[in-house]
């Protein structure tokens, strides 16, 4: 059994209004991750991903590579995250 970890990421650039959260959700679900993606007031998207470390790294690499074609990612900040609860799915928050 591999250990489950969580990472929080903030994605900056042209990432709102371009289907970014939906694409991130689809990508995360394919990787078996839980967590959420939500738009922040500063125009960035916050992503919390929990699951196998390797799969989280794949999601972060996908985010850094630019995510969906319609988006333009300028920078991605990540740090380890200790959520206050367990996520049972990967959801889109509003």
UniProtKB/Swiss-Prot annotation:
Protein origin, superkingdom: Bacteria
Molecular function via GO: acylphosphatase activity
Residues covered by the Acylphosphatase-like domain: 6-94
Residues annotated as the enzyme's active site: 21, 39
Keyword Hydrolase (UniProt): yes
Pfam family, one: Acylphosphatase
InterPro entries with a match to the protein in the record: Acylphosphatase, Acylphosphatase-like_dom, Acylphosphatase-like_dom_sf, Acylphosphatase_bac, Acylphosphatase_CS
EC number(s) per entry: 3.6.1.7
Matches recorded under PROSITE patterns: ACYLPHOSPHATASE_1, ACYLPHOSPHATASE_2, ACYLPHOSPHATASE_3
Listed SUPFAM superfamilies: Acylphosphatase/BLUF domain-like
Keyword line: Hydrolase
Catalytic reaction equation(s): an acyl phosphate + H2O = a carboxylate + phosphate + H(+)
Family: Belongs to the acylphosphatase family.
Protein name: Acylphosphatase
Lineage, highest ranks first: Bacteria, Pseudomonadati, Pseudomonadota, Gammaproteobacteria, Enterobacterales
């Amino acid at each position: 059994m591999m250990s489950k970890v969580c990472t929080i990421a903030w994605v900056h650039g042209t990432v709102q209004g371009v289907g970014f959260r939906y694409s991130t959700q689809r990508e995360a679900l394919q990787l078996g991750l839980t967590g959420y993606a939500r738009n922040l007031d500063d125009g960035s998207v916050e992503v919390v991903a929990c699951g196998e470390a390797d799969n989280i790294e794949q999601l972060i690499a996908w985010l850094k590579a630019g995510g969906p074609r319609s988006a333009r990612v300028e920078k991605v900040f990540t740090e380890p995250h200790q959520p206050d609860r367990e996520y049972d799915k990967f959801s889109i928050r509003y």
